[in-house]
Each structure stands twice: as structure tokens, then as C-alpha cells.
Amino acid sequence: MSYAEKPDEITKDEWMEKLNNLHVQRADMNRLIMNYLVTEGFKEAAEKFRMESGIEPSVDLETLDERIKIREMILKGQIQEAIALINSLHPELLDTNRYLYFHLQQQHLIELIRQRETEAALEFAQTQLAEQGEESRECLTEMERTLALLAFDSPEESPFGDLLHMMQRQKVWSEVNQAVLDYENRESTPKLAKLLKLLLWAQNELDQKKVKYPKMTDLSKGVIEEPK
């Protein structure tokens, strides 16, 4: 075949056959899983997986305890307590990462609104967040979006109701987790996430070149569709 010719299109069955012929070492898969559990702070799961797989974590699992406490506080909406613990562990972290500190303060404001503490929410926004809103257009926009929840009798059902979802707390925790790991000079992104990003990048490159190939359309389920 010359370079001017287009390669034959590959079917999904042919693609799957090629994938099935590739061998991935079980130990490599186990290391990826352990890396994910440690990076995300799942201590108990990492301990059980170590017993089942024989794979040793890259760090002492006892070092995960403080991050686990911070995660539990944030996911329960105990933001001020989480800030206090972060400051006790790494006093300079929030001073040097102003956006992270703003997002934690914003989350505390969200929790006040969730509890229908309107006056406390307005006072907190004015005394703790107004200055950051003046310094950053992005912060101002996020603060205005948060305060807009007060205009609705049922803020959960408002256009800004996503701020009251558990995913919002999870988002803040993920940001804190990454910042703490970076501050401690530890790996902050699981290797598994990097591999998935690499897959998406490769598919995007093929899409831009108008190549027809069996595409993975659902990463969580591993769904691969026929070439289109």
C-alpha cells in the first residue's frame, strides 16, 4: 500500500481481537489500583488490597490519616474545621494558594445557605469574601452565583442548585487533596487517571485526522462503538 492510499477500515471485532491479544501483567494492574487508592486517600481499601494482592503501597498508609480526616470534614460540610486542620498541618498552604482558600470559604458560605442561616451567610460573604471578589473577577462571579441561592425559596431546585449537591463538596475535596499532595511533593494525580487522559488525547488526535476507528465512548463502562 502506498502512502497516498487510505488504510482499510478496521471493524470493532477486529479491534477487540487485537486488544485481546495484548497482555497486561496482573502486577501492573494491581500497582495502578494501589496507586489510585493511595493517591485518593482510601486507606482501608488500600490495606485490604495489599493483603489480597501482595502489592506494597509506595508510602506508609498511616500518613493518609490526616488527609482522610480532612476529606470526612469537607464531605460532611464541616468546612471551618477542615480549614483549621489544614492550617495546623501546613500553615502556609492556604496563604500561598488563594484560590483554594477562596473555594473553601465559598463552600462554607454554601453550607450556611444550606442551613437557611441567611443573616450569617450575608455577613460571612461581606466580611470574608468581598475583598477576594474585588481582587478577582472569577471569584466575584462564583460569589455572586453562590449568593443567588438566597433568592429562591427552594435553592436546591434553582438554576444554581448544583452548588448544593454532594458533588460540589467532592469537587472541593479533590482540589484540597491535590493541593496537599503537591505541597508535600507527592504524586497528586493517580496514574490511572493519566492513562485515561492519554486515551482521550489519542482518540481526539484520530478524530481530528478524520480516522474511522472503534471509539471508546464510555470510560466508566469501557463501551466501544463501531467506526462511524
From Swiss-Prot:
Keyword terms: Cytoplasm, Nucleus, Ubl conjugation, Wnt signaling pathway
GO molecular function: protein homodimerization activity
First-listed, main subcellular location of the protein, grouped into a coarse class: cytoplasm
PTM remark: Polyubiquitinated through 'Lys-48'-polyubiquitin chains, leading to proteasomal degradation in the absence of Wnt stimulation.
Similarity section: Belongs to the GID8 family.
Subunit composition and interactions: Homodimer; may also form higher oligomers. Identified in the CTLH complex that contains GID4, RANBP9 and/or RANBP10, MKLN1, MAEA, RMND5A (or alternatively its paralog RMND5B), GID8, ARMC8, WDR26 and YPEL5. Within this complex, MAEA, RMND5A (or alternatively its paralog RMND5B), GID8, WDR26, and RANBP9 and/or RANBP10 form the catalytic core, while GID4, MKLN1, ARMC8 and YPEL5 have ancillary roles. Interacts with RANBP9. Part of a complex consisting of RANBP9, MKLN1 and GID8. Interacts with CTNNB1, AXIN1 and GSK3B.
Protein name: Glucose-induced degradation protein 8 homolog
Natural source organism: Mus musculus
